[in-house]
């Protein structure tokens, strides 16, 4: 009995030793696996530190770029105010921080909260106003018994323009547009205040401008939604400048005496077309530079002998292309007596024929401007003989020598107003 108990105790001790050995083996194996995994991933901690450093550098770059942006915008503001030296200092500081800040900057101005930049309700700050005219009219009439188009910002002892009646103010606006149809000045005037914006959108002004351009062919504004849209979208010639084309070619000169040398000449000349709202047109072909010629085309009373005067009309054919037809001729001389004061001097004989030139042009748009290109489609000379009344027509081939005319706006043409619209 005692021997059996001893055998049982020995078996239990051997089982406990085996369990202890297995647990130690498992612990050693787990430690080995952990060490092995740490050896396989030695840079995991380094990657975390690298990502933190990259994030820190990115924040520093963003802060530096924001600082450079503020300095650059400050330099722009100082330059606009005339403080050139201060502007140079800010420009230099901005360029030292970010050399290419000029190309990264966004010039759109954010509204200033101190000056009422949030003129819309908070729920409408990011929503585009569909009908700005209706909105401004509502703002002016809201809470005002007597609507005023504008109010003076500072106190003044003189009479402010807001004291003028609406009819007088509209008459001033017609003077701004003038008989030259300077609608560009009207658009600039509408930027002054909300009241001027409303006056500049008056349909009668735009209707009068459309009637000056298209006459009886625009009695209805369909398919356009307004007279202003018709004036801006419908093809027309422009009056606030001149259409210019440049043609150049090379021709042979005369041979030298020894026959070994022949000169070559590069010939350049310009064509100018100036349109007026009353249907008149001036045409000039000359080798003179536009810097010299353009000021002479400001008035219809120009004294240049080479200028041809005439009239034009707009035509929209079935192919939906707008064409301009021009008829020009030399201005007739004033009638003088047959004999001058000196009996030995006769005046120049009356020409036996009259010459006129007929031009056909196709109106199109090129680049970012509208209606700024005229392409030649026809050019002919009509000679009418006084003795017989016969007219001879000579048509010219429209080839590459007839380069398109492009519009150039001339500020001096609309600098003064002679008559209201």
From Swiss-Prot:
Range of residues in the leader sequence: none
Listed Basic and acidic residues bias regions: 54-63
Predominant place of localization: cytoplasm
Cross-referenced InterPro entries: F-box-like_dom_sf, F-box_dom, Hrt3/FBXO9_C, MIT_dom_sf
UniProt-annotated location(s): Cytoplasm
Presence of the UniProt keyword Cytoplasm in the record: yes
Pathway: Protein modification; protein ubiquitination
Biological processes per GO annotation: protein ubiquitination; regulation of TOR signaling; SCF-dependent proteasomal ubiquitin-dependent protein catabolic process
Stretches assigned to the F-box domain: 158-209
Extent of the TPR repeats: 68-101
Cellular component, GO, one term: cytoplasm
Compositionally biased residues, Polar residues: 40-52
Comp. bias regions, Acidic residues: 11-20
Region (Disordered): 1-63
Keywords: Cytoplasm, TPR repeat, Ubl conjugation pathway
Assembly and binders: Part of the SCF (SKP1-CUL1-F-box) E3 ubiquitin-protein ligase complex SCF(fbxo9).
Function noted in UniProt: Substrate recognition component of a SCF (SKP1-CUL1-F-box protein) E3 ubiquitin-protein ligase complex which mediates the ubiquitination and subsequent proteasomal degradation of target proteins and acts as a regulator of mTOR signaling.
Protein's name in the database: F-box only protein 9
Organism from which the protein derives: Danio rerio
Gene: fbxo9
């Amino acid at each position: 009995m005692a021997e059996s108990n001893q055998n049982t105790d020995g078996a239990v001790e051997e089982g406990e030793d085996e369990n202890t050995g297995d647990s130690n083996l498992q612990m050693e194996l787990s430690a080995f696996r952990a060490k092995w995994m740490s050896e396989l991933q030695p840079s995991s901690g380094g990657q975390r530190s690298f990502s933190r450093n990259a994030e820190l550098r990115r924040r520093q770059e963003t802060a530096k770029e924001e600082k450079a942006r503020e300095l650059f915008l400050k330099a722009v503001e100082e330059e606009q105010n005339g403080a050139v030296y201060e502007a140079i200092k800010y420009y230099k500081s901005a360029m030292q921080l970010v050399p290419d800040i000029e190309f990264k900057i966004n010039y759109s101005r954010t509204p200033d909260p101190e000056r009422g930049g949030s003129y819309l309700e908070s729920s409408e700050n990011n929503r585009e106003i569909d009908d700005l005219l209706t909105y401004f009219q509502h703002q002016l009439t809201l809470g005002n018994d007597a609507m005023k188009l504008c109010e003076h910002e500072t106190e003044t002892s003189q009479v402010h323009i807001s004291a003028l009646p609406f009819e007088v103010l509209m008459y001033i606006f017609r003077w701004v547009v003038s008989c030259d149809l300077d609608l560009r000045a009207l658009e600039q005037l509408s930027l002054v205040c909300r009241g001027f914006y409303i006056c500049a959108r008056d349909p009668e002004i735009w209707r009068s401008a459309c009637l000056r351009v298209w006459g009886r062919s625009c009695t209805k504004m369909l398919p356009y939604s307004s007279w202003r849209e018709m004036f801006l979208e419908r093809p027309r010639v422009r009056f606030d400048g001149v259409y210019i084309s440049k043609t150049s070619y090379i021709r042979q000169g005369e041979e030298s005496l020894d026959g070994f040398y022949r000169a070559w000449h590069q010939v350049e000349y310009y064509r100018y077309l100036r349109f007026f709202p009353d249907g008149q047109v001036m045409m000039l072909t000359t080798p003179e530079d536009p810097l010299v010629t353009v000021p002479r085309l400001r008035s219809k009373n120009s004294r240049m002998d080479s200028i041809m005067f005439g009239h034009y009309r707009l035509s929209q054919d079935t192919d939906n292309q707008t064409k301009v037809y021009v008829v020009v001729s030399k201005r007739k001389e004033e009638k003088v007596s047959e004999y001058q004061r000196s009996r030995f001097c006769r005046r120049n004989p009356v020409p036996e024929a009259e010459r006129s030139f007929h031009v056909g042009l196709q109106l199109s748009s090129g680049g970012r401007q509208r209606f700024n290109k005229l392409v030649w489609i026809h050019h002919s000379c009509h000679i009418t003989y006084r003795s017989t009344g016969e007219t001879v027509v000579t048509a010219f081939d429209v080839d590459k020598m007839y380069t398109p005319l492009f519009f150039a706006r001339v500020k001096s043409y609309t600098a003064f107003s002679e008559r209201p619209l």
